[in-house]
Structure formats: C-alpha cells, structure tokens
Amino acid sequence: MNDEQQNSNQSENTKKPFFQSLFGRFFQGELKNREELVEVIRDSEQNDLIDQNTREMIEGVMEIAELRVRDIMIPRSQIIFIEDQQDLNTCLNTIIESAHSRFPVIADADDRDNIVGILHAKDLLKFLREDAEVFDLSSLLRPVVIVPESKRVDRMLKDFRSERFHMAIVVDEFGAVSGLVTIEDILEQIVGDIEDEFDEEEIADIRQLSRHTYAVRALTDIDDFNAQFNTDFDDEEVDTIGGLIMQTFGYLPKRGEEIILKNLQFKVTSADSRRLIQLRVTVPDEHLAEMNNVDEKSE
C-alpha cells in the first residue's frame, strides 16, 4: 500500500465515525433544539463534510421559518409605481431608469393603496413594433396578489412556487400598502445576495441612458454627483442630490416637475409623499464637452 492510499484510508476512517455520530444523533432523537442542529451543521463544515456555502444555505433555510414578510419586504417608500393612464413612452422610461421587471400599477397618484394590477416589462415589447396609439395599459395588467405583513416567509416561498407568481403586495393590519416582496428577496435569505447585470449600476447610483441623459438616484451623495458631472454643488446643508433639489424647490416636488441648476436639467421621475426617489438629469452639449475634457485630463 502506497502513502497516498494509506492517507486516503485514514481520511475515510476519520469521516466514518463522524457520519455515524451525526446520523446517530438524528435518528436516535438526540437533537432537542435548533441550537444543537446548528452545532451539528457547523461541525460538519469543520470536518470538511460540507463547505461554507452549503452550511450557509442550510442555515438560511432554517432562518426563513422564523422570518415574517415584513422582515424582508421592500418598503413602500422604495416602490416604483406606474399610473394606469401613462402612455407607452412614459412607461418605457420608467422601466429603463429603474431596471425592474415588474411594477405595481395605481389608478391615482395620490392613492397608492389602490393597486389595480401588476405590469410585466416584457409585455411592452410587442408595442415597440406596433403603433403606440393602440397601447392600452389596462389590458396588460396581471392580477395583484395581496399578503399580510405577518405571513411567514417559508409559506410565502411555498405560495410563490405553487401558484407560479414572483411578486406580492404587502399590506398592514389596516389594509394599507406597506411594501412588496419578491421570490428573489426570499432566495437571497437562503443563498445570499443575487447580483444581476443591473446591481453594479444601481450601487453606483448614476446610470447613463443616452449621450445626454442620466438616471440618478435621489440618495446619491453630492460629492459623487459632482465628480460624475463636473459640478460644484455645496454639501454643507444637504448630503444628497435629492436633498439639494428639494431645498431648491422649497418643497417636495412631484413626479414630472423640472428645474435647471448649473446648466443641468433635473426632472423628478419617481417620488412618494415623503421623499424623492429617482431623477433624470439632462446634460447640454456645452457641459458635456466640459465633462469630457475633465475625463481626458484625468487619463
């Protein structure tokens, strides 16, 4: 027997007693609580029976049984709504700027508790080849699934799988919308953050839509905005570009309102009753040239 075979046999011999101990504790009913089960799982990792990712996934599955939908939902203030009277171009701009695939649709901008349906972004694709005048948003809406904040996350996952839907609107005890939850939100509790092609851009807060236009999150730091657009907005009184826009207006502007600051045009593309969410910034040619000159010098 060579050394490699001997080492392999020794490794197998050390694993067998652990396996026997592990399964023995399962089948003999020695595990009395969750803490003991977690201990066994972590022992399994230390003995190289499972890797770190597997251990974290197992623990994630165990943890979702203790979570409620309110613990993982996207809060109401971060939901991007579409109004059922918006035209095709407005809907497309909202979809492009947010990079989401599903949107709650409301009948009245001042009543966000009255959600009339869910719009799937893919349902708009056919209108790119058809006459926009035949566009009827109401005909594209999917049914709304309503769930209470107190619903258990593991039951929510079961419903997502069995009923084959991916988004639910979360309401509080009074029936008011408090947030939304997606199947991705639950899966991230199990496997960790799921990054898609848009996540890096969302983290950056600023996303270029065309040569002259940018989608900018209202929470973008003024310093980051200045660095991107070669501006010198003061951050002594406010920290974010959304705060600066509100300060300049003197009130909370509604979606669609515009203002020009330092040759840049700011348009509110998403807002709720408490804060700004998303802005569209249009850069004129002369300022674009200044931005390009700064980029060339930095290189």
UniProtKB/Swiss-Prot annotation:
Q: Name one GO molecular function term.
A: flavin adenine dinucleotide binding
Which GO CC terms are listed, alphabetically?
plasma membrane
Q: Which Pfam families match?
A: CBS, CorC_HlyC, NMB0537_N
Q: Transmembrane ranges?
A: none
What positions does the domain CBS occupy? 73-134, 140-197
Lineage top rank: taxon: Bacteria
Record key words, sorted: CBS domain, Cobalt, Magnesium, Repeat, Transport
Q: Does the keyword Magnesium apply?
A: yes
* Keyword match Manganese: no
Q: Which CDD domains match?
A: CBS_pair_CorC_HlyC_assoc
Tell me the function of this protein: Plays a role in the transport of magnesium and cobalt ions.
What is the similarity comment for this entry? Belongs to the UPF0053 family.
Protein's name according to its UniProt entry: Magnesium and cobalt efflux protein CorC
Q: Which organism is it from?
A: Haemophilus influenzae (strain ATCC 51907 / DSM 11121 / KW20 / Rd)
Taxonomy of the source species: Bacteria, Pseudomonadati, Pseudomonadota, Gammaproteobacteria, Pasteurellales
Gene from which this protein is expressed: corC
